[in-house]
Amino acid sequence: MPKRPHPPPTRRKKTPKAPETADEYLAVAVELEESGERWRSGDVAKAGRFFVQAITAYESTLVRYPNNFDARYNRARLLYTLTQLPLPPTFFPTTSTPEARLLAAAEAHRECNDLEQNSSDILFNYGQTLSSLGEFYANKPEEGEDLLEGGGVAGGEETLAKEIERLLSSKQAFENSWGVLQQCLVVQEADYKSTLEQSQSFGGIRDGGDDMNEKDDDDDDDDDENGGVKLPSVEERRNSTASSQSSNSGGGSGGNNATQWASILEPTTKLSILDTALTMLEVQTSILTLSTPATATKIFSKEYLEQITIHANTILENYILPIAAGLHEAEDDDEYSRLGLETNEISEKEMEATLSRTNFLTALAETKYYLGLSTLETWEDEVKSAFDPYTLYPPPPPPTTSPSPQPPEEYKGIIDLTTSWMALCDRSTAYTTLSTAILPTNPSKSWKLLSTISSPSLSSATKLAPKKEKPGIYLARGNLELLRSKIPIEAAIKGKEVLLKNAGVYYRGVVASAGSSLIGAVDGVKIKEFVEEARVKEAVIKLEHEGDWEPLKAVARSGVNREAVWRVVKGAVEDGVFGRETLGVIEAGMRG
C-alpha cells in the first residue's frame, strides 16, 4: 500500500497587532468602512455588518482619544448611512427603532457641528439627516394601525389628532433641516468668495513672473490652473473617509512608518452651492406636501405660506436658476469650464433645477387650495403653468442684421419637461391629485384629466425611463387604471371591465420588468416592495369583483406577510382605488 503523503503544515493566522496610536485606531475603522462600501451594491446586509463594526471601531477610538474629530465625523456619517440602507428590521436589535437611529445620527452630527461650526460638509450632512427625520415622521405608520396589533379601520377625532401631531413633528424636522442648510449656504458663499480672492491673487503673482515661472508652469500642466493639485469632486469629498492631520487625532503617530492621515479640502464651487440650494428647495417642497384636505388648516396658515414662498423665490432667483443658467454657458466661462461637466451632466442639472421649481409650485398650488386661498380653476391653471416649457434665462438679443428675434423653438435654453421621465411622472402625480379633488363636484372633468394628461404622461415616461425605474412606473399605471374605474360616469362604467383588465396587465408588468434586468441590492429592495404591492392589488381586484379569495391566499403563501397585505390594502383604500367595504371584508377574512 503506497505511503500517503503528509498533509502540508497548517499555517497559523497571525494575530493582528492591536492598535496603539490614534492613527492606528482610525486605520482599523476606515478599513472596515471601506469593506462595507465594497459590498454596498451587492450585499446590503454584509455591508451593514461592516458599517456596524466600523462604527464600533470609531467609538473605540473616541474612548481612547476623545478629541479625535475624524472618528467623530466618520461615526456620525455612518450612523446616517445605516438609516438609509434597505436593511430588514431583524438586522437591528429589537430595542433599536428607525426613529431612534435617525435621532442618534442627528445628535452625532449636532455634536460635530458644535465642535467645528464652519464646515460646509458637516452642515450639509446634518441638514440631510434632519430632512430624513422629517420624511420618517411624514410616512410613519400610526401606532396600532397594523391588523395584528389590534388595529383596524381607524377614524374619529383621536386619529386626526395623532395625524396632526405626526405631521407637526415632520414639519419641525424639515424646518430644522432648512435652517441648517441655510447656514451651510452662508459658509459655502464665504468659502467661495475666499477661493476667488485667492485665485485672483495667485493669478496676479503668476502673471508678473519671469521666464523661470513660465517654465514652472510647463512642469505643472497636470495641476489645476489656479496652482493647486487636482482635487476630488464634491461628492467624493462628502463621502470621503480620509481623516485630517494627525496632530488633530489626539495622539502621536507612533513611528516614522505609521499611516499618516490628511484631509484634502476642495474649494467650494458654484456647483456645490447649487446642490445645497436644490436641497433647500426640496425641503420646502416636502413641507408643503404634508398638507391634506383634513389637516392643512391645522399645520399651515396664510402667513406661513407667504413666508415660505418668499424664501423659495430667494433660493430660486439668487442661486438655483442663475447658477444652472451659467452651466449652460460653460464653454464661454472659464470659471464654469473648470467644473469639468460633460454636456449630458449640464443638461441633467438644468432639468433638475427646472423640475425643482415646478414641484415647489405644484405643491404650493395644492396647499393654497386646501387652505381656501384659491379655487379649483386656479389650482389647475397653476399646475398647467408649472409644467409649461421653461427658460432658465432670457434668450439672447437678436442680431443687428435681423429685425426679428430668434424663434423660441430654436432656442436651446428652453427646458421641455416632457423630455424627462421624472418630470412626466411628477406631472401625472400632480394632475392625479388635482383630479381627486375635482371628482366629487365634477367627475367628468376628473375623468378627462386622468385620461388625457395623467395616463399619457406615464405612458411616455415608460418609454424614457431606465429599466430599473420601470417597475415603479408600471405600478403607478395600474393604480391609475383602478382610480379611473371608480369614477361615476358612463365612460368609466361601460369600460370598467377593460380598465380592471388593464390594471392587472400593468401589475403583472411590475413583476415582469423587475426580473428583466440586473438590479443592484439597494434598488432591489425597493423593487421587491413594488412587486409585493402589485401582486396584492391584482389579487384584491379578483376578490372585490369576483369574490375569489384564492389569489390573495396564494400571495400570502408566497411569502408576503399579513402586515404587508394589510398595509397595501389600507393605503389603496385611502387613495380611493379600493372601497372601504373591501377593507372590512379583508380584515374579517384575515382575522378568521
Set out the residue ranges of the language-model regions.
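Structural marker of alpha-solenoid helical repeat scaffolds
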Residues: 64, 115, 187, 464-466, ...
